[in-house]
Curated annotation (Swiss-Prot):
GO terms for cellular component: extracellular region. This is Maximins 1/H12. Keywords: Amidation, Amphibian defense peptide, Antibiotic, Antimicrobial, Cleavage on pair of basic residues, Cytolysis, Fungicide, Hemolysis, Secreted, Signal. Residues 19-43, 74-123 form a propeptide. Its main location: secreted. GO terms for biological process: defense response to bacterium; defense response to fungus; killing of cells of another organism. Residues 1-18 form the signal peptide. It is found in: Secreted. InterPro entries: Bombinin. Belongs to the bombinin family. The modification Asparagine amide is found at residue 70. Maximin-1 shows antibacterial activity against both Gram-positive and Gram-negative bacteria. It also shows antimicrobial activity against the fungus C.albicans, but not against A.flavus nor P.uticale. It has little hemolytic activity. It possess a significant cytotoxicity against tumor cell lines. It does not possess a significant anti-HIV activity. It shows high spermicidal activity. Expressed by the skin glands.
Length: 144
């Protein structure tokens, strides 16, 4: 009698444990799915924000470039224009990375390419913000 009781209790414990493991796996997979959906939403929002910022920045840079292009330029303004053109090319290369990498890889080896991309990442935001602030400052000086 004790043996049958022990077997029955062991069977109940094993089945309860199996059910709890199954429930844990289901809840983990549901959490994973929810986390993945959240990450996709966040990435989508981030991509939209970045796209909007890039579009606004490109528009502002084009406006500044046209402002500088229409009038007579000093040497300093000419240098600013050249920098704006470089920034515009960098922004365009972000939109079409395959074409940019093909152009850039024609004459470089792999180590130089890695250094080039690292430098491009470092030099993109600093000069863009500097140029925009300098250009806006110059425009405000000219207006005022």
């Amino acid at each position: 009698m004790n043996f049958k009781y022990i077997v029955a209790v062991s069977f109940l414990i094993a089945s309860a444990y199996a059910r709890s493991e199954e429930n844990d796996e289901q809840s983990l997979s549901q959490r994973d799915v929810l986390e993945e959906e959240s990450l996709r939403e966040i990435r989508g929002i981030g991509t939209k924000i970045l796209g909007g910022v890039k579009t606004a920045l490109k528009g502002a840079l084009k406006e500044l470039a046209s402002t500088y292009a229409n009038g007579k330029r000093t040497a300093e303004e000419h240098e600013v224009m050249k920098r704006l053109e470089v920034v515009m090319r960098d922004l365009d290369s972000l939109d079409y990375p395959e074409e940019a990498s093909e152009r850039e890889t024609r004459d470089f080896n792999q180590e130089e390419i890695a250094n080039l991309y690292t430098k491009k990442e470092k030099r993109l935001l600093g000069p863009v913000l500097g140029l925009v602030s300098n250009a806006l400052g110059g425009l405000l000086k000219n207006i005022g």
